[in-house]
Amino acid sequence: MQQAAVEQNAEAFVIGGYVRDLMLKRLNKDIDIVTSGDGPALANRTAELLNVKRVSIFANFGTAHFVYKGSEVEFVSARKESYRATSRKPDVEKGSLEDDQMRRDFTVNAMALSLQEDSFGELVDPFNGLLDLENKILRTPLEPAITYSDDPLRMMRAVRFASQLNFTIEEKSLHAIKENAARLEIVSVERTMVEFNKILLSKKPSVGMKLLFDTELLHQFFPEMVKLHGVEKRNNNAHK
């Protein structure tokens, strides 16, 4: 990958969840690569060098993907994103590494590791994600109200990570989730349920369920469950 980037006169970095889990010593087979050059072109050349036969190109998103030794490797060009109020699908334009880190959901997912020969393995962490990781804090790179309003699915992801990793959602961020809970309506039910299922499958689903209730996210996609709050069962009879 380093060789492919040099050939294209570009820089490449590992970014996101793989870096986070590497620091936490957790297994992660999803590897995200961001480049200052052309993401699909870097993917194609890297695949050639690794003798990978199949590369999936997603031209509309400017991304590419292949599987190597059981790991899913995705390539994307560094970019900026802007959102419209009615959609969580962003308008995209070319950007810098820091622009790309800024668009990430949480500081712990915005850390990057350099793949350049002269700085290989160097951590690029403009938002102090490593400190938040050590303190088990979920914080957004941008103002949380902007982060969650732009892409409301990130609110579900915040709860999921809190439940999976036993992290605490930073107070300002938690308040922004409560304020923006109704924005979840622009997210498809399918995407919301994927995150909900991951919360239920986490080690401490009770943590996630309490957060979903307290932030009123649960009210948006599962109001029937909210109505059960306060129901007691005595002698096989339910009481409200």
Feature annotation, model-predicted:
Residues M1-K240:
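Catalytic cores of the polymerase beta-like nucleotidyltransferase superfamily
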